[in-house]
Structures are given as C-alpha cells and as structure tokens.
Amino acid sequence: MKEKLIIKNFGPIESIDLDLGKITVLIGEQASGKSTVAKVLAICRYFSYIVNDSSIVNENYESEFVATALRDWGLNGYEKNDSYINYINSDYSVEIISEKVEINKEFSFYSFIPKIKPKSDSFRDLLKSLYEIKPRAEENSNIEVIWGIPHSFLMTDVKSVMDNPFYFPTERGLQSIFSLGKSSIPNLSDSLFNQFAKLDQIARNFKNEVEIEPLNLIYKNQNGEGYFKIKGQNEFYKLSQGASGFKTSIPIILGIKYYNSLKRRSKTFIVEEPEQNLFPTAQKKLVEFLVGSINSSNNNFLIPTHSPYILTSLENLMYAHKIANGNNGELKEKVNEIIDEKYWINQEDVCVYYLGDGTHKDILQRDEALIDKDYIDSVSKSINSEYDQLLDLDVAMQN
C-alpha cells in the first residue's frame, strides 16, 4: 500500500490528505506548507520517536514525544486547537490530536494525544522485543541507552523493520561550516543541524574518487576537506571554493550513494528544493539520478520544489515508461535510445501535489502521464502579459 499523510489545522496547513508514492513532489508558493509536510513526514517516520513511545499503542493519553519532536524539527508553535496528524504505512499508523489546556486566562498550552497502531507482524514483533529488553536496559547501567532504548536494539532489531528518513534541508550547502557549531547557523532546528553532522560524516567516508554523475564531476575527501574536478581533467579544487550548485547538490548525491552502498533496506530521502543553484540541464540530470536510485535501490523521495524543470523532467521519465510499455513493448528499444531505461518510472509510483491556501490539489493527469503545470505556467502568463502591455506602449510611441 502507498503511504498516506493527513494533516489538519497545523501551521499553514488547513486540510490535506496525501497519498505518497515512491517519488512525491510538492509545489507551491513560499509559506504554502511544503516544508511543514516534509518535516511532519520525517517525524512520523523517525523510529526513535515512534518506537520509544510504543507504550502508547492503542492508548489515548498525553505524551511528550510529540512536543519533543516538534521542538526538534522547528515546528513548535505550529499547533492549534484540534490540530490533527495521521500517518499510515504498511507497518504502523500514527495518529496525533492536540487539545488546548487553559490554566488560567493568561496561560494556556497544547497537549498532544498520540496513538500508534501496529499493522504488520514484523512491527508487532519489534514492539514485543522492545517490551522485553527495555526493562533490562533501564536496570543495567552497562548497556548504552538512547532515549531509554538500547543502542544495539536500535541498530539491529529496529533497522530490520524501519529506518529513519534522511533529510536534505535547503541549508545543506552550509554543511561545510558544521564544525563551527549550531550557533553559526541562525534559526536552525536541532534535528536539521544533526543532518549536517551526518552529511559531514558521510562526506568524510568518500576518501576514494567517486563520480557525481549529474554534474559530470569527480569528488574525493582528504582530511575532512572536500575536493572536486571536472570529469576527464586532472586538477582538483576545494569544494568550499566551488560553484554554489556544486555545494548544494554534491551532498545530496553523496548521501544517496552512501546509503545505496549499504544495501540494507529501502531508504526515504526528503530533498528540499533540489534545483538550488542548478542550470536546467543539471536539474534534469539530478532528477534522472533520483529516479535511477528508486529503480536500483527501491528508495523513496519527497521533494518540495519551485522548479518547472523538475516537473518536466519527471514527466518525461513517466511518459517514456508509458510509451515503452504500450503496444506490447514495440517501441521499447526506440524509447531507450532517447531516455535510458534505468530512468523510466511508472506513473503509479509518482504523486505530484500543488499546495496553496492551506489545502492541496493532485496535479498528475494519470491518463496521459502528464503534470498539470498551469499553476507554474500562470506566472509565465502574467510575465508575458506585462511584456505585451509594455510592447503595446512602445509600439504606440513609435507611431
């Protein structure tokens, strides 16, 4: 089954009900709720929050894990009376309801009542194992414990069933200054700063040369410093002195390559604005890289974006799949000559939503495997209209 995420009365979101595919794209203007959706999904997929509160399965009482998670991800203050979040996947569901608690006329706060329901046998077995091991860990000071859960349990039992998503924030280009400390990046939440720490560590693992296909680059890390060169050339340059597009895109590619190399289970990646500082051709190649990762490693992606090139590139990959698999596959070889088969994707694995005015609209036209880009093209129409009006004035003056 597809994942589902429902959010109501939370931050800029009034009411959305999203099916999530292997790749889900969110478009919309600034402050439309794209990042809110991305961070809520991250919270609901984070096993440290979910498994640590396994004691609330099918129960209804206040829990601190929601408040902690919102604070960690910079979403505290987004809650409202009757805020509602419901996340469902094949293993478990998480339902969260907020209630306003008024102490007196001058002071009130929101309490959160979560409910977690197992859906798969593997998740039920996971919770059963946790019930058995957690009391022993709490009694034995020699066992390394994270949030009350033994570290060994997180690294083996939990990861065999579920895995944390990896979040690439818009600030990812700043990961090189991670060592300066969190205070060097104002207004950055703890969890996003932790992503910088992971990116920094991942980058250090690539001591040998690795190809960055979408940018036609070669990357390597020496003594904690990133270096790159143009493929086919000899001289390396410091990444810190490279183009902005390199700084924002290389972390994405390294992170995905790293987790693919582990060959464990599929991974969910949340990539905010992958188009940052990239020429349209590079955006196209990056989309191909992401879809190729889905096909080779069964990964999942959530992509908040503003770029029409991201949408058009994804549309072409869906259309290629549709044509190649129609008419008994007669056109498969010819389609492969245009777009490599490893980048094709079934439209059934894709979801595209426009967010605005607190709600959403599904803009994927599945009959034709096309994305309704009127929501972006309307801006072009407005710009063209202004140009036409200016042109009319100019022509009138010439006459």
Please report, for each region that a protein language model flagged, where it lies by residue:
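Switch/communication elements of ASCE P-loop NTPase nucleotide-binding domains
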Residues: 1-52, 227-383
